From Swiss-Prot:
Species of the source: Prochlorococcus marinus (strain MIT 9301)
PROSITE patterns: RIBOSOMAL_L13
Coiled-coil segments: none
Subunit structure: Part of the 50S ribosomal subunit.
Keyword Ribonucleoprotein: yes
Protein name in the entry: Large ribosomal subunit protein uL13
Classification via PANTHER family: LARGE RIBOSOMAL SUBUNIT PROTEIN UL13M, RIBOSOMAL PROTEIN L13
Listed InterPro entries: Ribosomal_uL13, Ribosomal_uL13_bac-type, Ribosomal_uL13_CS, Ribosomal_uL13_sf
Family named by the database record: Belongs to the universal ribosomal protein uL13 family.
């Protein structure tokens, strides 16, 4: 009978991938990123271990949404104080902090526990085409 092999933390190999968000649809891009962050693209995927890779996203300000979402999609946040609800449209958030749009979309697709928070830390999102991770030799992710 075959035994299921659980990878140890020492044997997990982490690669660096580069994703260009230019002219990509937000949700479709986020699902591919979340899959790589979780490690579901690897044969050694284990649900309770962080087997995923690092992902660098560039050109975050050029990500697209379909339909009227650019003018109608709302992002809500709350300061925790009474009356502290802030609501912002996709367009204004894309001008102000485009990295947050991709981060929030991917974060919602990861597990909502300590493992998901650990996997989310391996996501690096940048406005523009430059990133400080050239030393890691990131491989372009086919998407």
């Amino acid at each position: 009978m075959n035994k299921t092999i659980t990878p140890s933390l020492e044997t997990i190999e982490r690669n660096w991938f580069l994703v260009d968000a230019k002219d990509k649809t937000l949700g479709r891009l986020a699902t591919e990123i979340a899959t790589v962050l979780r490690g579901k693209n690897k044969p050694t995927f284990t649900p309770h271990l962080d087997t995923g890779d690092f992902v660098i996203v560039v050109n975050a300000e050029k990500v697209e949404v379909t339909g009227k979402k650019a003018s109608q999609k709302l992002y809500r946040r709350h300061s925790g104080r009474p009356g502290g609800m802030k609501i912002e449209k996709f367009e204004s958030l894309q001008e102000r902090i485009p990295e947050r749009i991709i981060e929030q979309a991917v974060k919602g697709m990861l597990p909502h526990n300590s493992l998901g928070r650990q996997q989310f830390k391996k996501l690096k999102v940048y406005k523009g085409a430059d990133h400080p991770h050239a030393a890691q030799n990131p491989v372009l992710l086919n998407s």
